[in-house]
Every structure is written in structure tokens, then in C-alpha cells.
């Protein structure tokens, strides 16, 4: 290659590097971390504020194949004293963490969302080609079904507690199981290995990949969650 071409290539690489570094410094999580460190300093003093980690944080759970970076912004998860704070600086309810520590379960296995992402919109998952958005009030409002955050989050409980007749603290799932029993759904459908064969097996219908559903009759969003809402 002659010198002009090499010069152009070099200039392009320099500009690309500058843009990359600039974009990296503009991530939202840097501001959230600075705000949390400031709040810790105001509440507990400068010495404790200096112990707040900086940079990207990640919880890696090999058994679940999950790498969650949620605590990059939600740094107060295990801190006492921020129970009344706004998200993402709010303490997580401790009674749940005692039986579901993040080191074992991660974050997205219960909450949903895109664990790899570190900016709010992609992390919370209301983006194209991501089928597991955060299960919360915003999602309920988007689908016009319910504005109770717990009602949606408890869907994740059934992944592990599928065979429990009742799950402590999961009132919505318990009610749904009782409703299926009272309405006699097993007369036509197999659920957890028992039931009729007139209709399809419903045991793992919620675990199917998004492309396995038929969306022809859906008028709104073409997602697996929308399919379940419609049915």
C-alpha cells in the first residue's frame, strides 16, 4: 500500500478509537456509580464510600449459564440503609436474598432482563430480538395486563417451583395453580405428567423458543409473552 492509503487507514483507526473511548465514558452506569458513592458518603462517611467498587460488575453463575451485570448500576443490592431509596440505589428485600443469593441464582433468572447489557434500556430488555424483558410494572403496562410488579415476577418462581403445590411468598402463582385445578384443565391437557390428551401438553409450553409460536392471529407485538397474554 502507498503512503496516502496508509495515512487514511491510520486516521480512520485514530478517529474510531477516539469515538470508542468517548462512547465508553458516556455509559449511564458511570453516573449511577458516582451517585451511589456520594449517597454512601453522605449517609455513612467518606471511609465507607471509598469501599464502594467502581467499574463494571458481573455475577457469573456457570450452572445457569448466566453472566449478569445488573449490580454495575444496582450497587445497593446487599447494602443496609437504602431500603427507602429509589432504584437503582435501593436495597434488595433481604428475606428473598437469604434463600436466593445472587451468587447462586444471578439476577435475571428471577427478574428477567438482558444480563450482559450495562445501559438501562437494553439491560431492562424492551428492545428488538430480546424475549426476556424485566418482569415489572413497565412490562405490565406495556401489555395492559397488570401493574403489580410481583404478579409478573412470580412467573419466574415456577421455573424451579413447578411441582410445588404451594410456594411460600408466591401468592399469584399459587392462585394460578389452584385455578387450573379448580377449572379441571387436566381433563384435556397434560400438566406435569398427568392429564388428558385432547389438547396439547402444557407442562413446558412457556419454555418454547420464540420462533416456535404461531403469531398469525396476533394484532399487536409478535413476542412469546404476547402470545401467552393472548391465550
Features from the language model and the residues they span:
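Extracytoplasmic electron-transfer domains, predominantly the class I c-type cytochrome c fold
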Residues: 93-159, 164-170, 174, 178, ...
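N-terminal export/targeting leaders of redox proteins
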Residues: 1-98, 141-146
